[in-house]
Amino acid sequence: MKYSKRYIAFTFILALIFVSNFYIYAKDSSTLGAFRGAQIDNTIWSPLVAADVNGTTIRLRIENKEYTSEDEHVYMDENRNIMVPVSMLRDALNSSAHVYNKNELLVEKHSLTADFKLADNNGFVQYKGQFYASLDKLSKLLDMTCSFDTATNTLTMTDKSEGVSTVPTKYDLRERQRVSLIRDQGSYGTCWAFAATSALESALMPEEQLLFSVDHMSMSNSFNVNQYDGGEYTMGMAYLAAWQGPVYDADDPYGDGVTRDDLAAVKHVQQMLIIDGKDYQGIKEAVFKYGGVQTSLYSTIASSKTKTPYYNKQTNSYCYMGQDKPNHDVVIIGWDDNYPKENFNVDLEGDGAFICQNSWGSSFGDNGVFYVSYYDTNVGTHNVVYTDIESADNYDNIYQSDLCGWVGKMGYDKEDMYGANIFTAQSAESLRASGFYATAADTSYK
């Protein structure tokens, strides 16, 4: 009996030693330990390491932003790559990240690109209906450092290109299949609704290619205006924030003078980003990361057939430098910092232009697209981009009172404010989210 106890104790000690050694080796994600001259097979060892890492919280520190596997579905695969949802890459890496044809991932940062085909050992996989990418493989292609701290289960990723612009000097969403169909507003004052729906469609591309109803946005909103009255970007924001739309164009086609109030929104817009006036870098980053940016111009052109001294028809280039306020909305779909100033009808200090999508049909400009100089008085003054668009079943209900959204602002020169709204629940429900407008950058809330 005494020997049995000794054997049991000895076995227990060996087990502790083995577990301790296993833990140490499992945390080593860069080498394989040899055991008495024998090399352990990587196909056996790596899954054990991954299982150990996935058994605890994985932490990510990416360019001063922090994430955990408790907040995002982050995991280590059987090849010891830290895998993150592709939906994280855009904001985590401050990059453009999109899936094409459900089998190809294109990530862009600075002037660098990382292109992956869907494959188990290629750094781009599909798991439980969601796409994932390897941070280690991305870092090697995007000039970033990537290290894994085994003691804290923390991956750290930093950009080696310090001081380099996030975006390239030239970018065109048409070349990335992220521009919606060119349409014609006709004689109606609906440019604001065309710009809003086009920007929304662009934000969903290339993963989804949808066509939303301009008729519904311009007629089934809460502003009690007709299609000849015109509008502005805040009206589109209010319509979308209230989940009054969007609806499909096929269900409420344009130009027939009637709309359908019985249609439900097919998408829920959960976040919109208002970009500060003349923040050209912010506009470029928004186009790069999210898609088309709705903006405003002053235009003396009423259609593709109208002539104006501010538009060079030969080069499809526009620049207005006066005091008149905006009266027309378009969508910024790209830029060219070196676009020649000589292409415009006015004398300019320097080169550079935004590439804009219009709503005057394909006969205007270059198949509906034209250039607007950086020196234009109004371009980039009022801007909005749609940054979070979810399926229409994300929530069961919405309670709201401000159906016209942001129509003005007032304040008391204070940094903090409190607000409240009271609604009567229709049944026993759980509050999952709340929405509001923040009219200043870097606003925090709780």
Residue ranges and their predicted role:
Residues Y3-S4, S69, Y280-Q281:
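A generic local structural motif
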Residues Y3-Y25:
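Sec-dependent N-terminal signal peptides of Gram-positive bacterial secreted proteins and lipoproteins
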Residues K5, N21-F22, S30-T31, S96, ...:
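Compositionally biased regions
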Residues Y7, G37, I62, N81, ...:
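Positively charged, low-complexity intrinsically disordered regions
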Residues I13, V86, L135, L200, ...:
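Generic structural marker for isolated residues within well-ordered, non-membrane alpha-helices
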Residues V19, S96, T145, A203-E207:
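Solvent-exposed amphipathic alpha-helical surface segments
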Residues Y25-T169:
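Primary recognition of N-terminal secretory signal peptides and signal-anchoring hydrophobic helices
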Residues D159-R432, Y437-K446:
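Catalytic-core signature of thiol
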